[in-house]
């Protein structure tokens, strides 16, 4: 996986968290930098850990699935991308549900619950990464840093932007995941030909 693909993956994986952060920022009277960075750290850590868990699960099964690994990566990334696009086009998403279920006071537990709700897809991406020649530590660090920056910015921008761009980030993230999955499949099939 190229460095550009890893960075794009990091930003694609952080779009759900960014949308949630915009919602949290919009719900706060006056978001402070301290609150925004705290949210970014919580989301970033969770978003960095979940692909590692998925990667470990994928590695455990990789010997049995090696002949189909490129199709699995393509299928998982494509399905997740399509899901994100559909959620972005609908009025409601997992992010909206997570926001509804969290209290108005955004304590650490509420942040962690929302962080886990928005990082389930990162675990599935981690499974697909187990079949690729990629250093999972680098990917996890990039995903965590992208999420940290996107969530911090999202909380601060939330008051001004609100619902205007929240859904569009999910759509963009979905398109990026589909493109990465398609690139993996293309590279494998063209290399095998």
UniProtKB/Swiss-Prot annotation:
What is the annotated localization of this protein? Cell inner membrane
Single GO molecular-function term? manganese ion transmembrane transporter activity
Please provide the record's keywords in A-Z order: Cell inner membrane, Cell membrane, Ion transport, Manganese, Membrane, Transmembrane, Transmembrane helix, Transport
Taxonomic superkingdom: Bacteria
Coiled-coil ranges per UniProt: none
Q: Name one Pfam family in it.
A: Mntp
Q: Which InterPro entries match?
A: Mntp/YtaF, Put_MntP
Alphabetical GO CC annotations of the entry are: plasma membrane
Listed transmembrane segments? 3-23, 37-57, 66-86, 109-131, 146-166, 171-191
Q: How does it sit in the membrane?
A: Multi-pass membrane protein
Q: Relate the protein's function as given in its record.
A: Probably functions as a manganese efflux pump.
UniProt lists the family membership as follows:
Belongs to the MntP (TC 9.B.29) family.
Per its record, how is this protein called by name? Putative manganese efflux pump MntP
Q: Which gene encodes it?
A: mntP
């Amino acid at each position: 996986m190229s460095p550009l693909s890893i960075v794009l993956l990091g930003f694609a994986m952080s779009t759900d968290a960014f949308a949630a952060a915009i919602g949290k920022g919009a719900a706060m009277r006056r978001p402070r930098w301290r609150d925004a960075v705290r949210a970014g750290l919580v989301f970033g850590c969770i978003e960095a850990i979940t692909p590692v868990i998925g990667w470990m699960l994928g590695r455990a099964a990789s010997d049995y699935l090696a002949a189909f690994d490129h199709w699995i990566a393509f299928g998982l990334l494509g399905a997740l991308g399509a899901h994100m696009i559909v959620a972005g086009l609908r009025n409601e998403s997992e992010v909206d549900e997570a926001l509804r279920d969290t209290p108005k006071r955004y304590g650490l537990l509420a942040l962690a619950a929302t962080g886990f709700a928005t990082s389930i897809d990162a675990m599935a991406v981690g499974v697909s990464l187990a079949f690729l020649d990629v250093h999972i530590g680098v990917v996890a660090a990039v995903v965590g840093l992208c999420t940290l920056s996107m969530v911090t910015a999202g909380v601060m921008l939330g008051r001004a932007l609100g619902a205007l761009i929240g859904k569009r980030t999910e759509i963009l993230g979905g398109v990026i995941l589909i493109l990465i999955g398609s690139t993996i499949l293309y590279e494998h099939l063209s290399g095998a030909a």
